[in-house]
Structures are given as C-alpha cells and as structure tokens.
Amino acid sequence: MKRIAHYKNGNYFVDLYEDGTKVRYNDLDNLTPEFVESMDCKISNNCPYGCRFCHEKSTPDGEHGDIMNAEFIDKLRPGTEMAIGGGAVTGHPDLIPFLKKLKSIGVIPSITVNQREYKDNFDLVNRLVEEKLIYGLGVSFTSFDDEFWDNAIKNNPNLVVHLIAGIHGGDVFDYFANKGVKILILGYKDFGRGHDLLEKARAIIQVQIDWLKNNLQNLLSKYTVISFDNLAIEQLDVKSVLTDEQWKEFYQGDDGTHTMYVDLVNKQFAKTSTSTERYPLLSNIDDMFKIIKGGN
C-alpha cells in the first residue's frame, strides 16, 4: 500500500497510507503531539435534505462558510487530515478551489456526503475522486439501493459507509456485510436536531443502540474494516469486545489529544462538533490546538 504522508509530530512519527491507515510510532511509552493531526471541518450549514437527527441543524437556507479566507489554513502542515462536512458540502461554491488549495499545501482532505447528495451530484463527487482532490469519501446511508451502492463502492476504493448507532438497525448492517465495504459507526449525537429527535423517540433509539452493542462481536467478524468515532466507542463499549493488544493497536486517542473541530460558517473551533465550549477562530492553527489540548 502506497504511503502518502510521513512526518514527525512531537515525540513520535506518523505514516499515513492511501487506504486511510494511520500508524503512529516511537520508542517511548507515550505519544505526545506538538500540533493537530486531523480535524473535522464544517464548511456549510446549507442542506436541502432535512435529516431528522442532524446535529448541525443544517437547513436549505443555511449559510456557506468563507472558506477561502481562513488564515489558519495557511499554517496547516503537510500530512494534516481534514474531514470536510456540512451541511451539503457539494453545494458550496468554493469547494473545488478550497480542495485545490489544500492539495497545494499538502493537506489530505476527505468529504462526507449524504447518499441523496451523492446521487444528486454524482459527476461532481466522482470528479473529486478521479482528480485526487479528496482521498476519502464518507457516504451517509439513507436508503437501500443496490445499483447506487454497487457502483459507488466499485468506483471508489476509499469509500466508507457512515452508519449511526440508534438510527440504523440490523437490516442495514446485514445489507453492507455482503458488499465488501468499510463502515464507520458514529455515536448518536444528542445535539441539534439529534436532541429533538431523542426527546420524541428515546426508547426506539435506545433499543437500536442496545441491539448494536449486543451484536458488536458478531458484526466485527462479518466486516473486513469497521471503525468507530469516540462517541460510538463510548456508547457501544467497544473496548469490551477487544483484547488489550487490539485496543492498544487500534484506539487513536481521546478527542482533543490529536484532533479538533473547526466551524468555518460561524468562525469557531472546539474539541468536537458537539462541544458547547467554543472559541473564535485564530490566525494560527497551533495556537488553536494549544487551547484544545489545554482543555483536556
């Protein structure tokens, strides 16, 4: 597998490969970073799809972020990963210039799109992949559609299906188990419209989370690659189904130790997208990350 980035961060080295695999290593008993390795970056709050659980509360009249003039972008180091989301990222008028700018400074971007957004902007998304303006493509499941999913998976080797604990049930997990695709399980976010939905359907959501938690060991045997965000790791008690060696190898660290969240619409940054404590953007990414680390 081709290595696309190699750098030193604090007291350790990082290797990043084109399939998304990341390896951190040193000869010490700790990994202490000097600068941020990866960030979630919201570029738009505009979205026509109205998902009931959207924690960003994106709407059809939501604003786009001023993504070409954020000063901290110029201070990002080569190899930094940026997971770009929204809102509907494909609707941002500066998406392609922004991705080209990131590529020119060595930043490694990925985007997350809703399944319907991908279908509505099929040529654009495929262009981003073909021109290597993005290295990763996350697609949030909304419906069963063999033609769509088979073509999307075939044409995008780095495609990852995003599924949400509490929203997607066993039928969805069984569906993708036979398609040879990577999945990312996201924890249920009690934030934004996600909070409103939880107030209305708490029992159903909890049943789905409990089902996933109880069937996790079985699912791990069905998929070649399953990953989790830290919220899902907590909600599903993922550590309990792994050996100590597996946990040590695969766990990437607590939120805010190597990562952060940036909202280019509201010009704020925080530890995660559900953090209530937020700060105004600064001109230097290192200063921003120091604030995040200081709050851990």
Regions found by a protein language model. Give the residues of each.
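Flexible mid-to-C-terminal extensions adjoining Fe-S/redox cofactors in radical SAM and related proteins
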Residues: M1-R24, Y261-N296
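Core AdoMet radical
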Residues: S38, E56-I67, P78-H92, L102-N121, ...
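Non-core capping and flanking segments associated with repeat-based/extracellular domains
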Residues: C47, K100-L102
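Ankyrin repeat (ANK) tandem alpha-helical domains that serve as protein-protein interaction scaffolds
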Residues: E71-K75, I96-K100
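Short amphipathic alpha-helix with an adjacent loop that forms part of the alpha/beta core around
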Residues: F72-K75, F122-V129, D150, F173-D174
